[in-house]
């Protein structure tokens, strides 16, 4: 029977490895919270976002606050040609890359009848295809950097479904499937990949929903409130660190007890 190694090191290692991390959707919300959480333990960060001004401003704040290298890049992940040049610029800005955190996304309320070939393709490109393209672009970097990891944001809507946002829900389900599919091959590179599925988090994407349905979601959540972006940031930081060295191909649900709640 295996026994505990009395010489095992239980010193917290949230800052290990110390390699750079690329964070999509890094100008706001969960992506920005993840950037702060990682920078706080000494990891350089590159914030990729369609909002160029927001990415640059957030990177400047992070660099000044934590004393790490930080860069803000304008990247439209719906364009497959944007990934390679952004990867080159990122390496030049923050050095060795040992992680990807994929948070970029939109949730367009279309219902079934509002789905078009154009918005369907755009949604899948942003949420799913870009994760694959970034993994391809940085695969050699990750393979060369011990302890490398990827975290991709999914959603509880991948499990529950949501009739108002079918593109988003389908894309987030695909993210989990892609994470599980890539985990096997990436393990051979020494690279871990996991998905995080948030519940109702107080981010800019939820502002309109909160205003339209005050108290609606809080009643359904065991903890009785929306989550804060920084609560997700801490979970992402854990998964990106050596603390989670035996986790890959997993979905981590962070929803305040929403999925398991029987409340109406």
PLM region spans:
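Active-site loop-to-helix junction immediately N-terminal to the catalytic Tyr of the SDR YXXXK motif
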Residues: 115, 161-169, 181, 209, ...
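Residue(s) in the substrate-gating loop at a strand-loop-helix junction
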Residues: 155
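Active-site helix of classical SDR
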Residues: 135, 171, 179
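Alpha-helical segment proximal to the catalytic Tyr-Lys
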Residues: 140, 184-188, 245
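C-terminal substrate-recognition "lid" of short-chain dehydrogenase/reductases
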Residues: 132, 225-254, 259
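Substrate-binding pocket helix/loop in short-chain dehydrogenase/reductase
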Residues: 111-112, 116-124, 217
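Short C-terminal tail/terminal secondary-structure segment
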Residues: 2-13, 160, 237, 248-264
